[in-house]
Curated annotation (Swiss-Prot):
Record-annotated active site: C19 (cysteine persulfide intermediate)
Originating organism: Shewanella halifaxensis (strain HAW-EB4)
Biological role stated in the UniProt entry: Sulfur carrier protein which probably makes part of a sulfur-relay system.
NCBIfam families: PRK00299.1 (NF001423)
GO cellular component, one term: cytoplasm
Designated name of the protein: Sulfur carrier protein TusA
Family: Belongs to the sulfur carrier protein TusA family.
Length: 81
């Protein structure tokens, strides 16, 4: 696992979930976080490759890193900009 991913303060396992569940879970998790905290999302739904970056842009969060070449996909987001 990339050092960036392993340093996440929170983790969300969305394996086996299909759209729209992963993004709904991300939204719920982020709401409980403080600004500046990080969340590692692990997912295997191909729709997350589009949905999570769009969610970050729409909700003004930062997508720090992503790994979408093979499953499980990994996304590291920071709450807020």
């Amino acid at each position: 696992m990339n050092d960036q991913f392993s340093a996440a303060q929170h983790q969300l396992d969305a394996l086996g979930l299909r759209c729209p569940e992963p993004v709904m879970m991300v939204r719920k998790s982020v709401r409980r976080m403080n600004d500046g905290e990080t969340l590692l999302i692990i997912a295997d739904d191909p729709a997350t490759t589009r949905d999570i970056p769009s969610f970050c842009e729409f909700m003004d969060h930062t997508l720090i890193a992503s790994q979408t070449e093979s499953t499980p996909y990994q996304y590291l987001i920071k709450k807020g900009l």
